[in-house]
Amino acid sequence: MYIGRFVVVGPSVAAYRVSSRSFPNRKLIERPAGLTVVPTADAEETTNPYVSYNCVRTAGGHAVVGNGSHVDPITEKVERGYPPRDALTEALLAMDYEKDDYDTPRIAGVLAPDGTAYVGIVRADAVLVRAVEEPTLVATYEKDAPEAIGFDAATAADAAREAYSAAFEHAVCAAGVSRRGVGDGYDTAVVNDP
């Protein structure tokens, strides 16, 4: 089944996977501000604004994961003290779904320093933001409402590997984030197409 890009969030780990039929020549790179999706050296040039973006950022004791440029305003809001639910809701509403040929939803999740976790999606027909207490998946297609999923990862590296190898079609790369402990920051990891 092809579900597109997806996030898995909560309660102490998060993951993001790029799954793509249209732009498979992408990889994740580590930058000081977090993890960024970029085209590979052999990718065709494109002006598509949805191909390269920060997909993981940590700031203000929070970790934010998502499938596009909305990761940045969510991160800025939690860093300024917004509750994660409000940061997700406001940024998703403001940026809306992607204005591409598929009306691709924007998906995101937040791990908070107090041990809580949230997941959200904005689609053409809805905005959903939820607190989660078990690993919860939301994807751009087919599984476009938050649902519990079996996800056993405990570390960032395990989360990235488990997301990458999940039984959904067209895996390109994956990111993982894990909380070191309540209030102790986060570890990140990447898996690029081997």
From Swiss-Prot:
<comment type="pathway">
    <text>Purine metabolism; IMP biosynthesis via de novo pathway; IMP from 5-formamido-1-(5-phospho-D-ribosyl)imidazole-4-carboxamide: step 1/1.</text>
</comment>
<dbReference type="InterPro" id="IPR020600">
    <property type="entry name" value="IMP_cyclohydrolase-like"/>
</dbReference>
<dbReference type="GO" id="GO:0006189">
    <property type="term" value="P:'de novo' IMP biosynthetic process"/>
</dbReference>
<dbReference type="InterPro" id="IPR010191">
    <property type="entry name" value="IMP_cyclohydrolase"/>
</dbReference>
<keyword id="KW-0378">Hydrolase</keyword>
<dbReference type="InterPro" id="IPR036795">
    <property type="entry name" value="IMP_cyclohydrolase-like_sf"/>
</dbReference>
<comment type="function">
    <text>Catalyzes the cyclization of 5-formylamidoimidazole-4-carboxamide ribonucleotide to IMP.</text>
</comment>
<dbReference type="GO" id="GO:0003937">
    <property type="term" value="F:IMP cyclohydrolase activity"/>
</dbReference>
<comment type="similarity">
    <text>Belongs to the archaeal IMP cyclohydrolase family.</text>
</comment>
<dbReference type="Pfam" id="PF07826">
    <property type="entry name" value="IMP_cyclohyd"/>
</dbReference>
<keyword id="KW-0658">Purine biosynthesis</keyword>
<protein>
    <recommendedName>
        <fullName>IMP cyclohydrolase</fullName>
        <ecNumber>3.5.4.10</ecNumber>
    </recommendedName>
</protein>
